[in-house]
Amino acid sequence: MTNDTARAVRVRYHTGTDAVMIRIPPARRGEPEMRCAERMHFVDAKGILTGSGGFPGMNVYRGCTHGCIYCDSRSAGYRFTHAFEDVEVKRNAPELLEQALKAKRRRSMIGTGSMSDPYMHCEEELRLTRRCLEVILQNGFGATVQTKSDRILRDLDLLDEINRSAKCVVQMTLTTYDDALCRIVEPNVCPTGRRIEVLHILRERQIPTVVWLTPVLPFLNDTEENVTAILNACVEAGVRGVVSFGMGLTLREGDREYYYAALDRHFPGLKARYIARYGNAYMLPSPKARELQALFQTVCAANGLLSSPEACFGWIRELPEKYTQLGLFDP
């Protein structure tokens, strides 16, 4: 038995009256061991698509095991009734999506990943995200997927087919160019270097991409070197645009406590600097926000990258007119 095989573990996920054993794979070579949830519960959801304005979205999972120290989805405002790492699985998501898409009068882009990453560890065996992509393809809709994980490459065949039949956009988050820092702030997902490799692979397949350069964590990754390195990587990978919300961080009840606990563990004394500067503010702009935003705008403009959230989201959500009309004999 190899060391990798020896490190593989099985964890028990509770489904109410049932218990399902799912194999969590070992860490990839050179990566830290994944610290995954020990519990996961399955639900029969009543609906799957949310949103308005012609851009519906879905979250197959609710909660996440990536462990990002800054995650806004931990906020009390989202009213989780279970621990964030006790991931809720909407086991009937593909069937609900099939019903919802067949009821629509016009095709559109379908988004996933805004609340919880669709490619966390359990997706390797549950394959619910893949099944939903199959439904999107079969019904002729477009798709946009937001993730931090290289597990998306498993579904490259579907992404390619969706992009050729309608439109597919992959949105990838790049927070810090420093892989060592990445393993602290985003501990249970592949490092930035690997995500950049994914962007290049997608470019080779002519699948368009957008990068989220957010959040910018005051006193951690808010440097010109970091922003420049990420933007240069975006240019080299041929991304269409970069999303930035002003070079800072937002904290609310729920995620603030988690973030500060992580600072205490990994960066002793830094929490005190945050409290002294920001108090309990919701928006925490970097002290260098103005300079970093100017740098961001300059590099994006020089390289033809979409740089405002409005421009990026507008382009992502746009499905060419020839794909939106549903014919009498469409499936």
What are these regions (language model features)?
Residues 89, 151-153, 218-221, 250:
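Acidic-and-aromatic substrate-binding clefts and catalytic sites of carbohydrate-active enzymes
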